[in-house]
Every structure is written in C-alpha cells, then in structure tokens.
Curated annotation (Swiss-Prot):
This is Gamma-glutamyl phosphate reductase. Keywords: Amino-acid biosynthesis, Cytoplasm, NADP, Oxidoreductase, Proline biosynthesis. Its EC number is 1.2.1.41. Pathway: Amino-acid biosynthesis; L-proline biosynthesis; L-glutamate 5-semialdehyde from L-glutamate: step 2/2. PROSITE patterns: PROA. CDD domains: ALDH_F18-19_ProA-GPR. It is found in: Cytoplasm. Belongs to the gamma-glutamyl phosphate reductase family. The gene is proA. Catalyzes the NADPH-dependent reduction of L-glutamate 5-phosphate into L-glutamate 5-semialdehyde and phosphate. The product spontaneously undergoes cyclization to form 1-pyrroline-5-carboxylate. One of its GO terms (biological process) is L-proline biosynthetic process. It comes from the Bacteria.
C-alpha cells in the first residue's frame, strides 16, 4: 500500500506540470522513449524471455503466451507507435466550438487532459508503451499496474521510459509502475479518487468486471470481445474464407478476433465443409450446433456455454441460422458489444445489420481484426471501449481528453 500511495501521489503532482506542457515538449519525450526502447532492446527481450519461460513452465496456453511474448518485430512496432503518435495532432487546447452571446460574452468549449490515469492490465507488455505514449501526448500522467506474468518485461520497459523522461522537460514521475503484484492492491488502486481521475482495466472478463463493480474512481471499461461473423446467403464465398481465417487465426488471443461464425442455412451445405477444412488447416478446433454437425459430423458439439464465451484461442463455434434476422437476434443475445461483421452482397441486409447491431464497431465485408487504434488511424490505443458513455471503440488521444468552458467577458454581470 505504501508503494501504491507514494506513486499515486507522484503522478498527481507530475500532472500539474504535464498538463501545461507544450506539444514540442511532449513529442520530444515520446521521441526519447523510442530511442531508449531501441537502445535497451536486448535488455527488454532478455527480461521478456524470462517471463515467457515462466509462463510455459506454468502451462499457460500458447495463445496467451503469444500475448506476452516480445521479439524484434514487436519492439520495432512499439518504436513505430511512438513515431506515429508524435505525428498525430495534439488534442489539448483544441477549441471544440465557440459562440458569442448577444451581450458580447464569448464562450468556448476547449479540450483539456482528463488527469492522472490508472491502467490495470494483464500479460501484454506492449500495452506499457502504447498507454504511456498516448497518456503523455494527451497531457495525462499514468500509473501502471501490470500482471505478474509480464513483471520482468514491464520493469525493463518502464525503466527505459523513465530514463528517457529524465532527458526531457517532462517529469519522470509522469509514468509510475507498481512492482508489487499483490492482487489486493488492485482494490486499493481503483479507490484512489484523491489522486486518479480515471481507471482503465485491460484484460479478461474477471478483471474488467471486478474493477467495474468495485471502483470509486471513474472507469473506462475496455471490453471482452465475443466477436461474430455472419455469412449471408448472398456472400461471395470464395472471398469470405480468407476474411474468416484472418479474423480467427491472425492473433487468436486478442479481443478483436472472431469467436463465433454464423452461416445462412441456404449456403450451409456448400460452405461449411470448405470453411471447416480451412480452419482446421490453421489449427482451429471447430465446434458446431446440431445443424452444423448434420453437414460436418466430426465437429465438436457446441453447448450453451460456448455461445457467450470469449475463447482467446484457436477455437471457433459455428451456428447455422435461417436468415439475417436470426443472426441479428443471436448476436444481440451473446455479443459483448465489441466488433461484429456481416459478409454479404445484399445492400438491404447490410444496412439492416449495421442499423440493428449495437457494437463499438460493425463491419460489412471485413475482418473484425481491424478494430484497433493503429488500424483506425489513431496511432496506438489505450484499449477498446465497449461502453457507450464518453468513449467507444479504440481509445486514442482525443478519447483521453475532456473539456472545460472558457468564458471571456468585459466585466459582465448577470442580469
């Protein structure tokens, strides 16, 4: 608790400096971070190797080990994310709108940083960099609490970040990392209203629901991704196959990977044998409803427990549906509101799907894997929000700000 309180106080104090930093100063800090990540690459990869070995010794499944693992390419991606964020427009100080009253009083709505942000996340060390650079660019200090799986990796990365900040005008304490992995600290952290303006949990359902249900600090809920793809009867089946394979297998341990496949009954006999074979070639365990198993008998029977489950693994459940209406009803029942996709050549069905599906991202003829800050042009992201209030979808720079009213008068008084 002593470490937590001490570091929470530090990020609150540092925010008074950071929120008034210039764009040039913030960009310089992010550039230095990129340089230090490159300089400390070997040290970071060695720390990560230790984390990965420990995870495998504990029997962690490979899809989750993949989320933990770093390599030169992923370090390069972190550096590229820094460069991208440097190139993004600084949202702080933007005049959202303004107007002048009849009496000459001028009112403007101006974008400002939210304040010190607490990030609670699990096994992805790249989150440490992505959240830090977005927080800094948007004028927010950050208190990081990573999972025990990635402790060595995160310590090495944060050490590089803080070393970089020492060479800039940005306070080193703008980024603090909680090294104590005691889970009881999570409860303490999410109740530090005196020091934190926002808490963002990034992880599985258990972590997110715990933070949401117990926090007194406002929470930006990043969501579980039980994502669906519906193959309509009019879909180009040849083009549909690579979309489904991409959505399921590119990185199955991410929240924007497809977990469920819905197939129109009129194309099921033609399409299911093809897509099941292709999925299996990519190492996917295929589960299916009764109608699916009538067509492809050797798929694993799907149970009711499958439909709401986010696998985060090379597993997919298939359901045959009568039409777009049944597909929509199924998605409404089991969706987590993350990313949902329809593959179709029918404009009316596409329009209906987009209109009736309530999710952060709704796709027509595209993989759900695009729900990502970088892919959407936001640079890095701090998470994918599935809530409706304040921010939804990839949370980038603009979503890490709020606003205040600036009112300019000539000694006006209210009549």
């Amino acid at each position: 608790m002593d470490e937590l309180l001490e570091k929470a106080k530090k990020v609150r104090e540092a925010w008074d400096v950071l929120r008034n930093a210039t764009t040039r100063e913030k960009n310089k800090a992010i550039k230095k971070i990129a340089e230090k990540l490159d300089e400390r690459r070997k040290e970071i990869l060695e720390a990560n190797r230790i984390d990965v070995e420990k995870a495998r010794e504990r029997g962690v499944k490979e899809s989750l080990v993949d989320r933990l693992a770093l390599n030169d390419k992923r370090i390069d991606e972190m550096i590229k994310a820094c460069e991208t964020v440097i190139g993004l427009k600084d949202p702080v100080g933007e005049v959202i709108d303004s107007w002048v009253r009849e009496d000459g009083l001028r009112i403007a709505r101006v974008r400002v940083p939210i304040g010190p942000i607490g990030i609670i996340y699990e096994s992805r060390p790249n989150v440490t960099v992505e959240t830090t650079i977005l927080a800094l660019k948007s004028g927010n200090t950050i208190l990081l609490r990573g999972g025990s799986d990635a402790l060595n990796s995160n310590k090495a990365i944060v050490s590089a970040i803080r070393e970089a900040l020492k060479e800039t005008e940005i306070p080193e304490s703008s980024v603090e990392f909680i090294e104590n992995t005691d889970r009881s600290l999570v409860l303490e952290m999410i109740r530090l209203r005196e020091y934190l303006s926002l808490v963002i949990p990034r992880g599985g359902y258990g972590l997110i629901s715990f933070v949401r249900d117990n926090a007194t600090v406002p929470v930006l809920e990043t969501g579980v991704g039980n994502c669906h793809i519906f193959v309509d009867e009019s879909a180009d089946l040849k083009k549909a196959v690579p979309v489904i394979i991409n959505a399921k297998t590119q990185r199955p341990g991410t929240c924007n990977a497809a977990e469920k496949l819905l197939v129109h009954e009129k194309i099921a006999k033609e399409f299911l044998p093809v897509i099941v074979e292709e999925l299996r070639k990519h190492g996917v365990e295929v589960r299916g409803c009764e109608k699916t198993r009538e067509i492809v008998p050797d798929v694993v029977p799907a149970t009711e427990d499958d439909w709401p489950t986010e696998y985060l693994d090379l597993i997919i459940a298939i359901k045959v549906v009568k039409n777009v209406d049944e597909a929509i009803e199924h998605i409404k029942k089991y969706s987590t509101g993350h990313s949902e996709s329809i593959l179709t050549e029918n404009y009316s069905n596409a329009k209906k799907f987009v209109s009736e599906i309530d999710a952060a991202a709704v796709y027509v003829n595209a993989s759900t894997r695009f729900t990502d800050g970088g892919q959407f042009g936001f640079g890095a992201e701090i998470g994918i929000s599935t809530q409706r209030f304040h921010a939804r979808g990839p949370v980038g720079l603009r979503e890490l700000t709020t606003y205040k009213f600036v009112v300019l008068g000539e000694y006006h008084v209210r009549e």
